[in-house]
Amino acid sequence: MAKKLSEGQKLKIRDMLRQGVESKAIAEHLGVTSGQVAAISAHVTMGSYDKGQTKTDFDLAEEEPPSSKILSNLEQIEPQKSNKVNSGILLGENIETGDDDYWDPFPESGSTNPHALIVGESGVGKTETIRSVVTELAQKGINSIIFDYGQGFSLDDAPPEFLEYARPVEIHASRDGININPFQLFPFDINGPLNVAQRVADTFQRVYSQIGVQQHAVLRQAVIELLSDSEIKAENEETWQNDPPWFHGLQNQLEQLSNDGGNPQRRIAANVLSHISTVFVFNTFREGGEKLTWKDVAEADGKVFIIQLKGLEHSLERVVTEFLLWNLIGFIESIGPGPLKCFAVLDEAHKLAFDAGSPVEKLLREGRKFGIGLILASQQPEDFSSVAFSNTATKLIFQVADEDSKISRQISRKLRGGHSFEEIRQTITKLPRGVAYIVSENTGYITKIRQIKDRINSW
């Protein structure tokens, strides 16, 4: 016979938590699951309850194992009214308490960092969740930039509520090119064109594994010479303000080096050009491409910008993404530290490099200071590096196979009490569509993500 958790029990849990009683002891004393205690603990930690009480009830099956209790609640979710303080970004309804769950990425709230990681198999609701989250961010005046590799965020297939409330702007970079120059110098380039040359060569080397030490050196020198020919010289800082050449100029520079019979490195130059030639075939970075100004993005006051990359060759997708992120980093660092301004949403994380020195790694480590957050999404835990796992304060885990229990172990190590490793493992492999196991503030809880159409009345 199932029994309902009374308001008195909920208040008792909160009182015992404030007195420092361990979650396991509270659960045993009150006859509830440690997961339910952990869910309430998360809200207490985030200051989510007002002085009133939480109006909700949920079932407790006395004879079932904890993991069965968790999963059985998934089938009993009904809309509940909550008195929870409306702070942060609404995610959805907590299946163990009935309260609304919020993600609070804002540094002023004490968040470790604003970054979030989303993982789950195909068809479990990742795209819909991202749409809901960025639309919610837009209502708070926070802009988002989505890098779309598979047209999952195409406006042709977007729900009308997304079009109305997210006010999306679509940029067809793969089809029309984009008016951004990877040779642009930024204030953090303290060595001017030398920094630009190193950045370009490093990016190509990360993406094209065939580029070795010699090819890297030739590529770097080619960029330095190209910038010098455009009157941007390392030894003269006044020239660093000059307009840089457009990216296709690098192709001409490498061709000249490879055709110069007196150049001892002509074969290396030809080899480099053969590896990166696809970049120039598509000519994505061009003066006549679609205009994207980061200043306009930062000042848009609640919009979603979608950069369409579908149709580009796989390696070129990575190159374009890295150069765009470096350009974005240059802009945000030029205006200095500040409050949270925007999020970069990177789907299909297997297309990204998390190596030391990559733009993604830099944003994960330093984005908080400059007011930019990352939302990383992919189908498999293996697509994320240890840097990504350790530098994303919030994780949304949808149904995932987790055959080697890698993600279950990583999650259980981060939690303070609450669900056990076995509960987590069983739960994340059986979650229904649209339901995620969320890890934040060292607490794990299960949330039914609220779709855009079900949020409108709260805006």
Q: PLM features: what roles do these ranges have?
A:
Residues 4, 35-60:
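Short, solvent-exposed alpha-helical "recognition" segments
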Residues 96, 132-372, 427-442:
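P-loop NTPase motor domains
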Residues 5-21:
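Short, amphipathic alpha-helical "recognition" segments used to contact nucleic acids or chromatin
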Residues 102-134, 310-423, 453:
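Conserved P-loop NTPase motor cores
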Residues 51-124, 128-135, 395:
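Basic- and hydrophobic-enriched, low-structure N-terminal and domain-boundary segments
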Residues 62-84, 419-459:
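Phosphate-binding and hydrolysis-coupling loops of NTP-dependent motor/remodeling domains
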Residues 26-27:
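Short alpha-helical "recognition helix" segments of helix-turn-helix
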